């Protein structure tokens, strides 16, 4: 024998008793009597109606068994080395003072700037060298042998 539970009051519904209400979204509600069905349809909150099971649970009425608190395991963060950096190196970097960190960063930036400047100068020198060899500049159209406009001689 399957005993259902009232969707509103929480009361037991024995076979052959109660009514079934199917909402538009196909959710099924079972009611033990017209009283709980009526209150549900009025959109009353069962936690505020004194005789419902939900009210009794909410207001801690009657005998309730104390539910033992579930113990969750604390997560422990494990330090693992990153590819290309050992644990010692990571710890050393973390313990660096902000001033030292800032100085290192500025030093690296300066080195990068110098490197870029040197590359740019080398490129410029290369360009100047190749420009001297090429000689006079000829447009792409002339190089391809495009039709040359002949100047008018009648005037």
UniProtKB/Swiss-Prot annotation:
Domain of life per record: Eukaryota
An example molecular function term from Gene Ontology annotations: mRNA binding
UniProt GO BP: cytoplasmic translation; translational elongation; translational initiation
Entries under Pfam families matching the protein: Ribosomal_L24e
Localization terms from the record: Cytoplasm
Predominant place of localization: cytoplasm
Alphabetical UniProt keywords: Cytoplasm, Phosphoprotein, Ribonucleoprotein, Ribosomal protein
Region (Disordered): 66-155
InterPro entries according to UniProt: L24e/L24_sf, Ribosomal_eL24, Ribosomal_eL24-rel_N, Ribosomal_eL24_CS
GO cellular component terms attached to this protein's record: cytosol; cytosolic large ribosomal subunit
Compositionally skewed regions (Basic and acidic residues) per UniProt: 89-129
Modified residues (Phosphoserine): 7
Biological function: Component of the ribosome, a large ribonucleoprotein complex responsible for the synthesis of proteins in the cell. The small ribosomal subunit (SSU) binds messenger RNAs (mRNAs) and translates the encoded message by selecting cognate aminoacyl-transfer RNA (tRNA) molecules. The large subunit (LSU) contains the ribosomal catalytic site termed the peptidyl transferase center (PTC), which catalyzes the formation of peptide bonds, thereby polymerizing the amino acids delivered by tRNAs into a polypeptide chain.
PANTHER family: 60S RIBOSOMAL PROTEIN L24, RIBOSOMAL PROTEIN L24
Similarity annotation: Belongs to the eukaryotic ribosomal protein eL24 family.
Subunit structure: Component of the large ribosomal subunit (LSU). Mature yeast ribosomes consist of a small (40S) and a large (60S) subunit. The 40S small subunit contains 1 molecule of ribosomal RNA (18S rRNA) and 33 different proteins (encoded by 57 genes). The large 60S subunit contains 3 rRNA molecules (25S, 5.8S and 5S rRNA) and 46 different proteins (encoded by 81 genes).
Remarks, miscellaneous: Present with 36900 molecules/cell in log phase SD medium. There are 2 genes for eL24 in yeast.
Protein name stated in the entry: Large ribosomal subunit protein eL24B
Organism the protein comes from: Saccharomyces cerevisiae (strain ATCC 204508 / S288c)
Gene giving rise to this polypeptide: RPL24B
């Amino acid at each position: 024998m399957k005993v259902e539970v009232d969707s509103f009051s929480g009361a037991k519904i024995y076979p052959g008793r109660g009514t079934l209400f199917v909402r538009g979204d196909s959710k099924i509600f079972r009611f033990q009597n017209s009283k709980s069905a009526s209150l549900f349809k009025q959109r009353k909150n069962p936690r505020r109606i004194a005789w419902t099971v939900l009210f009794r649970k909410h207001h801690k009425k009657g005998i309730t068994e104390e539910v033992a608190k579930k113990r969750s395991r604390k997560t422990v963060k494990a330090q693992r080395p990153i590819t290309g950096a050992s644990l010692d190196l990571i710890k050393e970097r973390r313990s660096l003072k902000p001033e030292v960190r800032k100085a290192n960063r500025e030093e690296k930036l300066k080195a990068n700037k110098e490197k870029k400047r040197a590359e740019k100068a080398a490129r410029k020198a290369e360009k100047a060298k190749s420009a001297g060899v090429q000689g006079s500049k000829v447009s792409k159209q002339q190089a391809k042998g495009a039709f040359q406009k002949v100047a008018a001689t009648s005037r």
